[in-house]
Structures are given as structure tokens and as C-alpha cells.
């Protein structure tokens, strides 16, 4: 398999790999995630999935196994890791390639203007990043997704991307928003001594975790929980929750 560019579609390979929910409020519903599938109605949705770490890989697995169709995956560019500092793919990219899904890895999805004091080196880097963003946006438009699902992707999405899917973008966030917006919500909940946390499925806006919440799934934090143990439990809840949310969305129940 030829090596993928950081901004193009990675060819399929046998190698390893919003809608308008109800606004968040004190009365936002909390749900218990069931192993039983939601009542199915409406056609399967075309999904673009954006995520990077292990937490996001579990939800991708659930979507691949659902009745909905994942048409492409966005993940951050391969990063150097280990003693040899070899470039390694993200957990999400590995899952995507194992499922023969195309992968996009732009450094950014924002088109950045030139700065007044821009050096030649920065100009070259900016133009390369802008080209990657333009190619990724063109590929996403061509896919005509119904919805984008985002989980710990690590890049902010500009409004042009949020507006691209027919039904908008849904985010899987591992906290009971608005508490612990942003990065590392699992660790922050444990460090603060919270008695409970959870997973929110929310409509994405241009701000950081500021969109309206469609579903809240409460998870108690046990005395024996470490960040790793709680991470795995929340990843399982998030995976089930997003499949249920897409079933509701396709049936017109998530409005």
C-alpha cells in the first residue's frame, strides 16, 4: 500500500484501524444506555466519523457494526512515538483501515490567511496546510454525508465543516456538560472528586463544547475507579449512545 499523504484520502487497506437536539438545560433528559437496539425507522444515515484516540475508536467500531454507513473517517496525522520516534497511526485510523474505510488526515480544516509579519518558512507551512484543508473539504462535500459524528478528534471544526452534513454534526463528550468542557474531562472529574460523570451527545457549534445537548447518560464514579477504568466504561457508554442517537435522528425523534 502506498504511503498516505497527511491531507489526502488513505486508500482502503487490509491493515489495522447536529441534527437539532433539544437544548441543554436542567431539564435535559438523562438516559440509561441499553444493550437492546432502539426501534429502527427511517433510512440508514451516511456518516463521516472524526476521532483520534482509543476512546473514539470504540464508538467507531459500534457505528461500523450498526445499520448506518460510515463513508469516511477523519483522524489527526500520524505522530512520532516510542524510542525510535516512528510515525504511528492513531487508534481510530487503525480501526478505519481494518474496516477498509477511507481516511482523511488534514493538519487543519481551517483556511488561514497570511499574517503581516509572516516568514517564508511559515508561509510555506501555511500554504501546505491550507491545501490539505481544501482537499479534505472537497472530499467531504463529494461524500454527501447526512451527519458527522465527532469524538475526541483534537481539531476545532470551522463553521464551513459544521454546516456541511445535511443533519449537522454530533459530538460524543465524556462529561455531564456544561461541567468539564474541553480536554481531559475524565481526569478532571476524578481529580475534582466528582460523585458522577457521564456522556453527552450534543449538537456541535463553533465554540468549544457549547452546543445544545440532546442526551445525557449519567455514570457514577466509584471509589475504586482510576482514570483508565472510568475511561473504558465511558467509552462503552458513548459507543452505545451514539448508535441510539443516530437511530433516533433517522427516525425523526431527535429534533
Predicted features along the sequence, with ranges:
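One-carbon transfer enzymes
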Residues: 1-255
Amino acid at each position: 500500500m502506498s504511503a498516505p499523504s497527511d491531507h489526502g484520502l488513505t486508500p482502503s487497506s487490509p491493515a489495522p484501524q447536529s441534527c437539532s437536539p433539544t437544548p441543554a438545560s436542567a431539564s435535559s433528559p438523562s438516559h440509561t444506555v441499553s444493550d437492546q437496539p432502539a426501534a429502527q425507522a427511517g433510512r440508514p444515515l451516511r456518516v463521516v466519523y472524526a476521532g483520534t484516540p482509543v476512546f473514539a475508536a470504540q464508538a467507531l467500531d459500534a457505528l461500523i457494526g450498526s445499520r448506518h454507513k460510515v463513508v469516511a473517517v477523519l483522524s489527526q496525522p500520524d505522530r512520532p512515538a516510542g524510542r525510535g520516534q516512528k510515525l504511528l497511526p492513531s487508534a481510530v485510523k487503525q480501526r478505519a483501515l481494518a474496516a477498509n474505510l477511507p481516511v482523511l488526515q488534514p493538519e487543519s480544516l481551517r483556511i488561514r490567511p497570511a499574517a503581516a509579519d509572516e516568514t517564508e518558512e511559515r508561509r510555506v507551512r501555511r500554504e501546505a496546510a491550507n491545501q490539505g484543508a481544501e482537499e479534505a473539504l472537497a472530499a467531504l462535500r463529494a461524500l454527501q454525508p447526512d451527519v458527522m459524528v465527532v469524538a475526541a478528534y483534537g481539531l476545532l471544526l470551522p463553521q464551513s465543516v459544521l454546516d456541511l452534513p445535511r443533519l449537522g454534526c454530533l459530538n460524543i463528550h465524556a462529561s455531564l456538560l456544561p461541567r468539564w468542557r474541553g480536554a481531559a474531562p475524565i481526569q478532571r472529574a476524578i481529580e475534582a472528586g466528582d460523585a458522577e460523570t457521564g456522556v453527552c451527545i450534543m449538537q456541535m457549534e463553533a465554540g468549544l463544547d457549547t452546543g445544545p445537548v440532546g442526551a445525557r447518560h449519567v455514570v457514577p464514579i466509584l471509589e475504586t475507579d482510576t482514570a483508565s477504568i472510568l475511561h473504558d466504561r465511558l467509552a462503552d457508554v458513548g459507543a452505545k449512545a451514539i448508535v441510539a442517537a443516530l437511530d433516533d435522528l433517522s427516525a425523526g425523534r431527535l429534533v
